[in-house]
Amino acid sequence: KWSENGDTIGFKYADHITAVRHDGYTLVSLANPWRRGSVLHRYALVPRTDSARVAGSLPEGATVVYTPVERSVVFTSPHCFLLGALGADKVVDGECDFGYINLPYVQRGVKAGAIADCGNSMSPSIERIVSLRPQAVLVSPFEGASYGQLDHIGVPLVECADYMETSALGRAEWMRFYGMLIGREREADSLFAVVERNYKETMRLAATSRLRPKVITERVVSGVWYCPGGKSSMGRLIADAGARYAFAADGHSGSLTLAPEKVVAEASDADCWLFIYNGGKAPLPADLLAEYQGYKMLKAFAGGGVYGCGSATGVPYFEEVSFRPDLLLMDFVRIFHPDLGLK
């Protein structure tokens, strides 16, 4: 019978995941980030070579995933990026939201027919997913999430709740779990060690600056300004870069839905304004004002402190930032601390 005894695999920064290695399998528990004290999902990762031996001793209620996963459907671009970074791009047999994925190997694979486009992640093609015979489907959960027909196709759903971590390193550390899934545990541990080292070195560099600029992010969309919560990984990353996030006092780890007037009232004195833009051309000041006249009240708008990243210009921002926060942190330090003379 299953025993609680086993060797705990330490996660240094991630708060919502634990893993215990038992004889013949590894039990991974994902905490529910929306209901404190409850479990989102448990997985028993079983090497195929041990499947017969441990068949009767696995914990009840755990979703069994036979490892290494060699065929998968991946719903999110950050996880497509990670699998590629771990040398496991061949594991991706299907993906969703192809039009938003800025990864050459995925684009080539879909065009060549080696990777299937399974449609919109909110309403994917179940028939196409089933036809791929995946050994796991990597999905992005949300509060109260239901996966409809996906729950009934007999394929393990791996709920990628890493985005609910409250620190950038905590989110990135989930790569170690994904490494366990695909038989790239050593590679994932090595990559995370690089990310951690770079991140900490950059934090120390930021601390030497005399500047502590105030920062806001994002733009108005359909009359709403969506900002990262004060306890989100992005909010924490801005702080780690030696800046003051305008909503740092907020206690949420997800996104804030704010009236534009509230953002302007709270952050009109922000020195830096950062946002992502779609399309290949950066918006001009006139374009921004056509979107929302209130932007002209921002100190950053008037003072040249506006920085945009074009997600459709060959820059894989959405793909990389989750698991390579060290790269984004360095970009932030370059922006926030011109006194350091970084290029």
Language model feature labels by segment:
Residues 65-66, 130-131, 151-152, 208-211, ...:
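Extracellular/periplasmic catalytic domains that process cell-envelope and extracellular macromolecules
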Residues 114, 125, 131, 135-224, ...:
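Extracytoplasmic substrate-binding proteins
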Residues 87-89, 102-112, 151, 235-248:
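Ligand-binding cleft/hinge of the Venus flytrap
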Residues 1-80, 187-216, 315, 340-343:
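Bacterial Sec-exported substrate-binding components of ABC uptake systems
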Residues 293, 298-325:
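C-terminal regions of proteins
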Residues 71-74, 91-95, 136-140, 157-160, ...:
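Structural recognition of the beta-strand scaffold that forms the well-ordered cores
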Residues 26-132, 137-142:
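A short, structured surface patch at a secondary-structure boundary
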Residues 202-292:
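Flexible, glycine-rich surface segments
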